[in-house]
UniProtKB/Swiss-Prot annotation:
UniProt similarity note: Belongs to the GatC family.
UniProt GO BP: glutaminyl-tRNAGln biosynthesis via transamidation; regulation of translational fidelity; translation
Designated name of the protein: Aspartyl/glutamyl-tRNA(Asn/Gln) amidotransferase subunit C
HAMAP family: GatC
EC numbers: 6.3.5.-
Keywords noted in UniProt: ATP-binding, Ligase, Nucleotide-binding, Protein biosynthesis
NCBIfam families associated with the record: gatC (TIGR00135)
Function: Allows the formation of correctly charged Asn-tRNA(Asn) or Gln-tRNA(Gln) through the transamidation of misacylated Asp-tRNA(Asn) or Glu-tRNA(Gln) in organisms which lack either or both of asparaginyl-tRNA or glutaminyl-tRNA synthetases. The reaction takes place in the presence of glutamine and ATP through an activated phospho-Asp-tRNA(Asn) or phospho-Glu-tRNA(Gln).
Quaternary structure (record): Heterotrimer of A, B and C subunits.
Stored InterPro entries: Asp/Glu-ADT_sf_sub_c, GatC
Signal sequence, start to end: none
Catalytic activity: L-glutamyl-tRNA(Gln) + L-glutamine + ATP + H2O = L-glutaminyl-tRNA(Gln) + L-glutamate + ADP + phosphate + H(+); L-aspartyl-tRNA(Asn) + L-glutamine + ATP + H2O = L-asparaginyl-tRNA(Asn) + L-glutamate + ADP + phosphate + 2 H(+)
Any GO molecular function: asparaginyl-tRNA synthase (glutamine-hydrolyzing) activity
Length: 95
């Protein structure tokens, strides 16, 4: 993908970034290098490689899924300014 100096300036403008001519040239060189690396990676034939979710085929040991805290709903609602049917009542902010 070819990138021009005008493209860099336009993206900087869209991002609301003030960029000088010298900074735009430096950014163009850096972005062109990044796009070059991406093009190299896209050129690699990976059709014969099986997709994997992790580098090592191991199972992760997980802890038992259980409640670790006690229910404090009543305590929290006792200090709330307004509660009705277990719900917190708040002032209407949007008409």
């Amino acid at each position: 993908m070819s990138l021009s100096l005008d493209d860099v300036k336009r993206v900087a403008n869209l991002a609301r970034i003030e960029i000088s001519e010298d900074e735009a040239r430096k950014a163009l060189i850096q972005l062109s290098g990044i796009f070059g690396l991406i093009e190299q990676m896209q050129a690699v034939d990976v059709s014969a490689i099986t997709p994997m979710s992790h580098a090592q085929d191991v199972m992760q040991r997980l802890r038992a899924d259980g409640a670790t805290e006690i229910d404090q709903r009543e305590l929290f609602q006792s200090v709330a300014p307004q509660v009705e049917a277990g719900l917190y009542l708040v002032p209407k902010v949007i008409e």
